[in-house]
Amino acid sequence: MAEVVAVDVGATWVRMAIVRGGVIEAIKRERNPGTEEGLERVLQGLAEGLGIDRGRVEKVGAASIGPLDLRRGYIVGSPNIKSHIVRLSTILKRLFPKSKVAIANDAVAAAWGEYLLGRLAGTPDLGYITMSTGVGGGFVVGGRLLLGSRGNAHEVGHIVVDMGWEGGRCGCGGTGHWEAIAGGRWIPRTSSVLARGWRGPETSLYRAALEGRVGSAREVFEAAAVGDDFALHVIDYIARASAAGIASVKAAYDVDAVIIGGSVYLNNRRMLRPLIERHLAAYAPFSSRIEVVDASFGDNEGVMGAYAIAYRNPEDLPIF
């Protein structure tokens, strides 16, 4: 079976892998420099590091942060990188001149990967949610991958989950968005906002949040893991916002299952999943109960999604 080069362009990491028959044979990663020129250098370096004969690759799949201009294969206006436009299709065609290149939003590609290869493979109606630097989603309905007119039918991180949110704007400019509360880059800010109304014990994390000294989502989860009451309050709020988002997804797409991945969720799923499921019971009526499942491929969810869109092109997905 022919090999596929699978590329995962995330906000923090860029991964490239050689995948054959659904099995990753080799993989490398580098930090995303956040610029178009820097990304091209990183991709070239990854290809060289993997020993890929770039002139002989038949298929390339790329799972990318968005928003996308899917018809051109460009990243346009992403709040998570510096360059306003990244001509990803152009970069990949330069690097792999004889290849057929497929590009999709990372969460959309992951949904297709789960549908073709994951533990719920063949389930005709499923959703995939990534909780990582940001929050995104992808959906298969009736066995078809939903794309939207520009490839952005899946930007569920910008669902409003708190109309009274006073924590500042999302990276896109909106307020009260799921991503602005539960996205990894915003969790430190979420802790600071919640600290202003906290009436419980003055814990270490509470004092750090009140003074704006929480530097990462990891600090919040680590404090919660050792029983910091305020940290547990923050995690519960993040889970509640996420449950509201998932309930909205259920109402909009009528999927039978939602698969959750992304580093924020996967690294903390033992803490987050039971809280999300508990809050879902309040936000979704009994008749709309939804199965919540952990992602099948861990950190390689984007890579396997990239492989899937190249291996079996979804209907209406442009090929470059």
Curated annotation (Swiss-Prot):
Protein's recorded name: Glucokinase
Gene: glk
Cofactor(s) required for function per UniProt: a divalent metal cation
Keyword Kinase: yes
Highest rank taxon of the organism: Archaea
Gene Ontology BP term (one): glucose metabolic process
Source organism of this protein record: Aeropyrum pernix (strain ATCC 700893 / DSM 11879 / JCM 9820 / NBRC 100138 / K1)
Keywords: ATP-binding, Carbohydrate metabolism, Glucose metabolism, Kinase, Magnesium, Nucleotide-binding, Transferase
Temperature dependence as stated in the record: Activity increases exponentially up to 100 degrees Celsius, the highest temperature tested.
Lineage of the organism: Archaea, Thermoproteota, Thermoprotei, Desulfurococcales, Desulfurococcaceae
Function: Catalyzes the phosphorylation of D-glucose to D-glucose 6-phosphate using ATP as the phosphate donor. ITP can also serve as an effective phosphoryl donor. According to Hansen et al., the enzyme has a broad hexose specificity, and in addition to glucose, which shows the highest catalytic efficiency, it can also phosphorylate fructose, mannose, glucosamine, N-acetylglucosamine, N-acetylmannosamine and 2-deoxyglucose. However, according to Sakuraba et al., the enzyme shows strict specificity for D-glucose.
